[in-house]
Amino acid sequence: DNVVVYLTVLTDMTTLNTQTTRGPKQRREREKEALRQVILDAARELFVNEGYENVSMRRIADKIEYSPTTIYLYFEDKAALLFAVCEETFAKLAKRMESISRKSTDPVETLKRGCRAYVEFGLKYPNHYRVTFINHPDLHLGRENYLREGSMGMKCYSQLRANVEECIKQKRFRHGDLEALTQLMWAGGHGVASLLITKPDFPWVNKDKLIDLMIDVLIDGLKA
């Protein structure tokens, strides 16, 4: 009985020690992730308002009231920080697109909803969109890094491509050039999103009407 009691106490102490050790570690991880997000948010805002070329790591550090050394603990250089900002945008977009794909079995309907979601995403997160799609981050990162294999950017593009490919396989479109059609759909959505974001004072018609019309014109023109 004493052995059983001893083993029980020992087990409880081990569990307590593990929980005690795990608690501070988990807290540190949360704090680390929170600070990383603060850095990303500050960098995104500065890149939009002042231009990537004009923003230094020290400028970002000043904004969040930390030393530049702290930022370098999270990001190797400014290009790595820009890439992380873009990846965050693509990750948000990819998650939205995945949700749409799961809820629809009709590839054409999925494509329509995806195009609308793309534009709506840009309007909901204009700073994310500006940095990632309008301010030419590829010029600073290099095309091979901006759209490198395994990146969230390529994941988003691959989702769109797979959707268009399914429309072609089911003979829903009369054209079969997969790459051209994928790029066309992206260009259409980007055109509307970027103009609505960068030209807010233009006398646009109702935004929903404009988005729906763009989608209908593109897809109806492709239907078999």
Where are the model-predicted features located?
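N-terminal intrinsically disordered/low-complexity leader segments
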Residues: 1-34
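Hydrophobic/aromatic-rich alpha-helical bundle segments in the mid-to-C-terminal region
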Residues: 14, 144-146, 168-215
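Generic hydrophobic, amphipathic alpha-helix propensity
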Residues: 32-43, 60, 85-97, 160
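Helix-turn-helix
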Residues: 38, 42, 46-80, 84
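Hydrophobic alpha-helical connector segments
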Residues: 84, 98-128, 181-185
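Amphipathic alpha-helical linker/stalk segments
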Residues: 85-113, 143-150, 156, 163-166
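Short secondary-structure transition hinges
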Residues: 123-162, 180, 201-204, 208
